[in-house]
Amino acid sequence: MKKIIALHALFFSLLILLSGCTNGTIVNPTAEGQAFQINTYNYSDNHYLLDTIYKSNFIDFMAEGMLNTPENINRQISPDNFEVWVQTTNFTADRKFASMLIDLPSLPASGQYNDSFYVPGQIPGKRYFGLFRKLNSSEYYVNYQAGFIGLRINIPDNDYAGVTFKQNGTGQTFGTNSSNFTQDTLVLKMIKAGNIFPQTDTLAWEMKMKNVYRIPVIPILETGFEFQVNFVDPANPTPSPSLPNGRTVLNVVGLDRFIGHGPQLGQDNYFDFLNGRTIITETGDVIFPILRPFYDGILEATNNGFTGGDTTLICKAIYTKLKSEASIAPNNSMYIIKGRVKNF
């Protein structure tokens, strides 16, 4: 019986890896569970803030699981008429042409964008005109309070994606959705640009989240789930759960802030398994509460009040360079994400 279970685990892991939706590696699948390992520069490419202003919402929500400041509460997104569109080359009846802007303003009081918004044009990383298809709700998930989207499908690097949404508190609408507007061409708020470059496509780069890691096994069950972030000192390559100053890495990157499931604050040296917040069990997404955990999180933890943080321990390239460059940058292997999951 154990051999059958082990074979099932191996087959399931291979099936998920072949689907192309994950960023990690399965290590030694057994009947006791499947170990995984993920490099810190290999974050998910499927998660985006709806706008850079939602950085504040994200931090606010991840701290307590709810929004606290009036500004963030006002920006909370309505699920009504929320739409996601991705670039396509397939001409069918349900496709739409769309003009997409990274810095799209809210819809004017007249209820119509100026004609200039509908004119075909392209500025890399900022504006795009093309053919798009509307995603169904099974192809993505949205955190309406934190203001980010997770795509359940992969989109080619050179393709664009955009959304339409309305803010509950302000009443502002961004984009023209297909339910309320009958024009042949839509106007969309760009969330993903094609082939972005950090140095030139600054807004598009900021909106791409680099703090979500997709575990290569789904669905995730809390029972038997293990998640660790270890520090690897170049002078002593044995992985350690702690930084040289004794702070545990899991706490430093924001994933061990509570006793159990909370709300009591404190470290228990276990991953804070908060479904819908630090983990999405259906997709295997682990969401770090800090947008740049291996940069800002490390600096804050090593700040002794005089130096501003130990810059020799940060992985800046993750957040300033493309993955291909970050993978060969200094310190690229200083931290390793690993764990184990049982899903049967």
Feature roles, as predicted:
Residues M1-A9:
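Bacterial N-terminal signal peptides that target proteins for export
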Residues H8-S19:
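Bacterial N-terminal signal peptides
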Residues K2, C21-F344:
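Surface-exposed, low-hydrophobicity segments enriched in Gly/Pro/acidic/Ser residues
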